[in-house]
């Protein structure tokens, strides 16, 4: 199934390759969930954990898991509009319920450029994204989330909490020296992640941009080089194929 939202760095182009590389496991833990392309594309594992540090993102999936019909009911009569987008964007989160926060977030992500939630998405060759306004569109997502633990913790806490010999961690951290991610993730965080993955009992697969610094950090692990075509730009010269690495300890 498709992921219900779009996010910066989403794995729609790579998920088939990633899923084919997932080893045998009992517990599946996705540390940087984002849009969840791999999770929504693979067969369910016996135990599954999805996690992201983005509080609003995780609130959305929690609310879909428990209150999907109410989210659909409130979105049914909405439409794609710059005015509505700006109105949602300027809401004070402190005055909203968890359900209303999830509706706001879903609207902003689905109607924004590149799913960043900051700029209203428009075009002359594509239509607005209407799928969130349809009834029962969240049913499949709700069912997929039914037996999944949904966490909103730092990556280090997730690794500490769920690391077992039978655990597989899928890691898709913010890319090195790449702008556009909502949360700060610099060299300190990348090195901490590397150090923790070096010492886990389970297995991991990490996706990241192909950079000499990254190759140095993960020297000694297994590398698979891939080329991915990205088009998240209004400028044609910013589009094209980019090198990425799939790094594993197995």
Report the location of each language-model feature:
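SAM-dependent nucleic-acid methyltransferase catalytic core
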Residues: 1-13, 21, 65-170, 174-180, ...
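Conserved proline-anchored active-site loop of SAM-dependent methyltransferases
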Residues: 18, 28-42, 50-54, 109-113, ...
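SAM cofactor-binding core of SAM-dependent methyltransferases
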Residues: 20, 24-92
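Short, polar loop motifs at secondary-structure junctions
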Residues: 33-37, 136-138, 208-212
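Short, acidic/turn-prone active-site loops that include or flank metal/cofactor-
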Residues: 53-56, 175-176, 227-233
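Long, positively charged, glycine-interspersed low-complexity recognition regions
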Residues: 186-250
């Amino acid at each position: 199934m498709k992921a219900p939202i779009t996010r910066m760095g989403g794995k729609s182009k790579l998920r088939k390759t990633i899923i084919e590389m997932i080893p045998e496991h009992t517990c599946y833990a996705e540390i940087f969930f984002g849009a969840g392309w791999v999770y929504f594309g693979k067969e369910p594992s016996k135990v599954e954990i999805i996690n992201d540090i983005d509080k609003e993102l995780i609130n959305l999936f929690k609310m879909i898991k428990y209150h999907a019909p109410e989210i659909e009911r409130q979105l049914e009569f909405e439409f794609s509009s710059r005015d509505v987008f700006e109105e949602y964007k300027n809401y004070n989160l402190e005055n909203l319920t968890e359900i209303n926060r999830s509706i706001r977030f879903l609207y902003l992500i689905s109607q924004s450029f590149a799913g960043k939630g900051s700029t209203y998405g428009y075009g002359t060759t594509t239509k607005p994204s209407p799928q969130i306004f349809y009834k029962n569109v969240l049913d499949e997502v709700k069912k997929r989330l039914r037996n999944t633990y949904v966490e909103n913790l730092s990556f280090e806490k997730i690794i500490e909490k769920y690391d077992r010999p039978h655990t597989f961690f899928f890691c898709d951290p913010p890319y090195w020296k790449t702008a556009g991610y909502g949360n700060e993730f610099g060299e300190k965080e990348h090195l901490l992640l590397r150090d923790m993955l070096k010492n886990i009992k389970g297995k991991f697969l990490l996706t990241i941009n192909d950079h000499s610094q990254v190759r140095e950090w993960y020297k000694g692990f297994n590398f698979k080089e891939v080329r991915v075509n990205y088009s998240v730009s209004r400028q044609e010269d910013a589009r094209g194929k980019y090198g990425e690495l799939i790094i594993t300890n197995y």
